[in-house]
């Protein structure tokens, strides 16, 4: 065994070879040294266990190939572009909404240049970083003011911490939601230092339940939109309109966590109806929070709109600075919101709406092209079909609703295994992510952003 250890080259010997010098030129001295040490450590452990040299140390050429391979993997970006063929348009694990071209350009400009983030160009003095977007949101929603933080969970936390610390927040039992990542409304309330007061039952809550729970220690009445589940059957709930009337009567503000946050009526596009921010403001809600990267189709952000007196208090809270967005996110958000000033062009300019409203005819054409390319690459190892599919919006939006779609399905035909094919899909330069259902791989075209790039990627198979 000692003789085997002696056959291992030293780091210094590797570095002084022509191949070693080439590796240093390509990857840098520090990275090459670290990789050599790592592989030598692994080789010593292998020798102890197997009493033989690992193959990649059997000759110098193999050794340098192994070092080069490790260095290449180390340099690869791990958050990489994928082809979304899951049928879930706003897929949380795949990054939710795609940014519009306008948002991308605005963000790129903010990255490369100094921008008027907190500077009033007209007055020539400092301003607030939310000002530009606040003006836009007021125009779009009818609210008096707006506040921007880094996601909707942060928006909820900020509202609770600002107005309800040490006080009571009244909410229906049927709205004590949990969303992805174990985010629970009661847990956020506990973190904010407020006291949860549950009213009603899971399936039925009445206005009198809220009224009877109000005390002099009540901070506000809270409504949470149940976007990621539905309670059906024998149910009853209280609308924001009813709740705001009660709030005005009892001098208690009303807050709504809308979650997905649509700014247009989706039913006009043949999609499931989702309550809009404008509707909640019109119903008299004091504060409405929602996400920027769900139905809005933009960047990850938490947006709060509502009465000016309440927004000013949010802006003054110390947590606001902790939760604020940077210039890139704000630039992308502003550009996204400006698209809503021309709603007639939204399905053309906003990727989320473009994907959700693609006609089935176009999806069938894309499916035929995809099937043809797959058949040419897989050599009859699998059975491929074009089938009707059911896509979904995703990210907790309309979980019970499905959108007609088209998919290419792949089933086992010979000894070739779907699991092996799925693994091959994930090893491509731009991995292909589909879904497994009924013993088949489903490649749903509804959620695919670019058919041409996908077809080019498949040439790697």
UniProtKB/Swiss-Prot annotation:
It is found in: Cytoplasm. This is L-seryl-tRNA(Sec) selenium transferase. The modification N6-(pyridoxal phosphate)lysine is found at residue 294. It catalyses: L-seryl-tRNA(Sec) + selenophosphate + H(+) = L-selenocysteinyl-tRNA(Sec) + phosphate. Pfam families: Se-cys_synth_N, SelA. GO terms for biological process: conversion of seryl-tRNAsec to selenocys-tRNAsec; selenocysteine incorporation. NCBIfam families: selA. Gene3D superfamilies: 3.90.1150.180, Type I PLP-dependent aspartate aminotransferase-like (Major domain) (3.40.640.10). It is an enzyme of class 2 (transferase). The gene is selA. GO terms for cellular component: cytoplasm. Keywords: Cytoplasm, Protein biosynthesis, Pyridoxal phosphate, Selenium, Transferase. InterPro entries: PyrdxlP-dep_Trfase, PyrdxlP-dep_Trfase_major, SelA-like, SelA_trans, SelA_trans_N_dom. One of its GO terms (molecular function) is L-seryl-tRNA(Sec) selenium transferase activity. Belongs to the SelA family. Its cofactor is pyridoxal 5'-phosphate. Its main location: cytoplasm. Pathway: Aminoacyl-tRNA biosynthesis; selenocysteinyl-tRNA(Sec) biosynthesis; selenocysteinyl-tRNA(Sec) from L-seryl-tRNA(Sec) (bacterial route): step 1/1. Converts seryl-tRNA(Sec) to selenocysteinyl-tRNA(Sec) required for selenoprotein biosynthesis.
